[in-house]
Amino acid sequence: MTEEATGRAGDCESGDAIPASRVAGCTVGEAKTVIQRGLWFEEFEIGTTYLHRPGRTVTEADNVLFTTLTMNTQSLHLDAAWAAEQPGFRGERLVNSMFTLSTMVGLSVAQLTLGTIVANLGFSEVSFPKPVFHGDTLYAETVCTDKRESKSRPGEGIVSLAHTARNQHGDVVARAQRTTLVQKRPQR
């Protein structure tokens, strides 16, 4: 989603400091600015599937860096010789499933929540039906399953999302239900 603004010169020339999140929504002279952003609460549609592209090809460096940064020293992620001897691993190390989960959610950010999310409220029903290996490309899709206005936080709403990640063959490699707190469209 993009944010467009129209107006006349002076719209952005106030002597007051303008938050960086608002600068791109203004007009300078006759020029229109457009900012990439996620969806406001009102723009989420229950039942709509959002396809997130482009995909993300996972490298060995991604897996090793993520695994060591998060202190997960499982041999199945780090030890190539050990993994080569394990049945069902194709002779390869598995990509850390937390990297897969993080990437699945990350692929959705630009389209759904960039600059509009207040908080992740929780994840549930997380599963990894198939493993991810170095060289696999992940694609994500999200279905908005529910939304409601926040009772305790005016100007915000709760949006429930069902994320799915697939590899380059279309195999489902991850699923998760996610609940988020999202800003409503600002009142002007």
Predicted regions and their residues:
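HotDog/MaoC-like acyl-thioester-processing domains
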Residues: M1-I46, F128-T137, E141-R188
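Hot-dog-fold acyl-thioester-processing enzymes
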Residues: T2-E4, C12-L121, Q187-R188
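Generic structural detector for well-ordered beta-strands
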Residues: L51-T57, S127, T179-L181
